[in-house]
Curated annotation (Swiss-Prot):
Main location: membrane
Keywords, alphabetical: ATP-binding, Cell inner membrane, Cell membrane, Membrane, Nucleotide-binding, Repeat, Sugar transport, Translocase, Transport
Residues the record lists as binding ATP: G65, E66, N67, G68, A69, G70, K71, S72
Catalytic activity: D-ribose(out) + ATP + H2O = D-ribose(in) + ADP + phosphate + H(+); D-galactose(out) + ATP + H2O = D-galactose(in) + ADP + phosphate + H(+)
Domain ABC transporter: 33-269, 279-523
UniProt-recorded name of the protein: Putative ribose/galactose/methyl galactoside import ATP-binding protein
SMART domains: AAA (SM00382)
Record-linked PANTHER family: CARBOHYDRATE TRANSPORT ATP-BINDING PROTEIN MG119-RELATED, GALACTOSE_METHYL GALACTOSIDE IMPORT ATP-BINDING PROTEIN MGLA
Entries under Pfam families matching the protein: ABC_tran
CDD domains for this protein: ABC_Carb_Monos_I (cd03216), ABC_Carb_Monos_II (cd03215)
Length: 525
């Protein structure tokens, strides 16, 4: 799935105008949900400071802001997970307070989390009605009635799934549909969706958006949290922006463009999202010839020069990540040749790859990158700890000094190196993981979805860092599902489709149309 850093506004929708300077939208329609002067603090941190938010019935409100802006905290307050320190919540015009998520759900507010909360070994029907099972005259669970109600619910939402299918057999997108059906089954008037498209394909996104449009037509109020601006302009009626725990303002989506939205989010104008770079003139550092992994990808060939950024584009399942993992020795190739620094090499495991000068920032930092219960320093030192150990001792002072230097260079925002890394924002977690690999002094840096799930301000910092590393002679392979990112950062773009390399485009000839044409399985003639 390809996202976008900037996008064109959609056609105008019939909505009252919003404000652009922190006020409230015009009261031409009754509000479904109103948040007034809400504040929330944690030890040493003010997460929300006197914020407001209003949701109209039959509308999609996109909620945007950098990581740490307070979006998630406010949503957890609305959903009954946290209780506010001050302020008021009004639902359908009446003051409400929620002690638990169940009380919010019963009142008509449902939150669909980014990490889905379903039971994999239970059926769709059982997941939807868990805790609310229909009973027959004998006070036993009436499975037939549950099946009938689930089938009706899925049909109404145009979700083509069997109520008896086990949730564990469903794709991520299908599980999201089940979560939506479950929320609707509570007759929820307000649905909160947190990054719902972060791990689904372009086709699945289109299906999700059609369901959201149906819910909007039914009068539901939808709060849609996302970092992807193209989604905002495609699906949202209004956009609310938070920054540093404060409400910045609300605008109609069709009155904004990408630049004005970025300015609201970061508090400054980002005149250039992607830094300017000159085409490198370094020597070939890595040469890959007909690299293959049986059943996954075949005959992948390319050269990578020192100081070059090679982008790899393709739809999900195209084999991009598999190529990266093979180069790093996670899944050794079945055939083909890899030449590094002029010599043929056989990379059998990641340890060999690191010794040669390879580094890999993996696709899913939470699953394969972070040690969430460890500190920032413990996460950063993982790849170089052996270099500072000897005779049963670790050179803690020197190791700490290097970690501090990397934090300064990469602008990792953390109260201390002892801070648990799981408490940092997504952007700072990603920079800490990048610091881990830069401490190994790699010659080839492989970045798999380096800006996934981080805000636009952190993205700009990552882009500038990549450009700086390339200018210093590091060779970079960057895999990304965001097409503007690939085109904006790469000197050349390699495009893959179902395990096959479809072509390599030079920066001067690469366009969204050409890349999508190749990614869809069509050769450029």
């Amino acid at each position: 799935m390809f996202g976008s850093a900037t996008a064109n506004p959609p056609a105008q929708r019939n909505l009252p105008s919003g404000d652009g300077d922190g006020g409230a939208p015009d009261a031409q329609a009754p509000y479904l949900l109103e948040i007034s002067h809400v504040s929330k603090g944690f030890p040493g941190v003010v997460a929300l400071n006197d914020v407001q938010l209003r949701v109209r019935p039959g509308s999609v409100l996109a909620l945007m802001g950098e990581n740490g802006a307070g979006k998630s905290t406010l949503m957890k307050i609305i959903a009954g997970i946290y209780q506010p320190d001050a302020g008021e919540i009004r639902l359908r015009g009446k003051p409400v307070s929620f002690d638990t998520p169940l009380s919010a759900l019963q009142a008509g507010i449902a939150m669909i989390h980014q990490e889905l909360n379903l039971m994999p070994f239970m059926s769709i029907a059982e997941n939807i009605w868990i805790g609310r099972e229909q009973l027959n005259g004998l006070h036993m669970v009436d499975h037939r009635e549950m099946h009938r109600c689930t089938a009706e619910l899925l049909e109404r939402l145009r979700i083509k799934l069997d109520p008896e299918e086990l949730v564990g057999t469903l794709s991520i997108a299908e599980r999201q549909m089940v979560e939506i059906a479950k929320a609707v089954s509570y007759n929820s008037d307000v649905l909160i969706m947190d990054e719902p498209t972060s791990a689904i394909t372009e086709t699945e996104v289109a299906h999700l958006f059609s369901i959201i449009s149906d819910l909007r037509a039914q009068g539901k109020g939808i709060i849609y949290i996302t970092h992807k601006m193209n989604e905002v302009f495609e699906i949202a009626d209004e956009v609310a922006v938070f920054r540093d725990g404060a409400y910045i303002g609300l605008q109609r989506a069709d009155s904004m463009d990408g630049d004005s939205l970025i300015t609201m989010m970061v508090g400054r104008e980002l005149t250039q999202l992607f830094p300017e770079r000159e085409k490198p003139a370094g020597d070939v550092l890595l040469s890959v010839n007909r690299l293959s992994l049986n059943g996954i990808f075949k005959d992948v060939s390319f050269d990578l020069r020192a100081g070059e950024v090679l982008g790899i584009a393709g739809l999900m399942g195209s084999g991009r990540t598999n190529v990266a993992e093979t180069l790093f020795g996670i899944t050794p190739s079945d055939s083909g040749e890899v030449r590094f620094d002029g010599k043929t090499v056989h990379i059998g495991d990641p340890h060999q790859a690191i010794e040669l000068g390879f580094a890999l920032l993996t696709e899913d930092r939470k699953l394969t990158g972070l040690f969430p219960c460890l500190s920032v320093m413990e996460n950063m030192e993982m790849a170089v700890l052996a270099n500072y150990a000897g005779n049963g001792f670790v050179q803690q002072k020197a190791l700490r000094s290097q970690c501090e230097d990397m934090c300064k260079k990469l602008r990792v925002k953390t109260p201390s190196l002892e801070q648990c890394i799981d408490t940092l924002s997504g952007g700072n977690q990603q920079k800490a993981l990048l610091a881990r690999w830069l401490m190994t002094n790699p010659k080839v840096l492989i970045l798999d979805e380096p800006t996934r799930g981080i805000d636009v301000g952190a993205k700009v910092e990552i882009y500038r860092l990549i450009s700086l590393l390339a200018s210093e002679g590091m060779a970079v392979i960057m895999i990304s599902s965001e097409l503007p990112e690939v085109l904006g950062m790469s000197d050349r773009v390699m495009v893959m489709h179902e395990g096959e390399m479809m072509g390599i485009l030079d920066r001067s000839e690469a366009t969204q149309e050409k890349v999508m044409h190749l990614a869809s399985g069509h050769k450029v003639h």
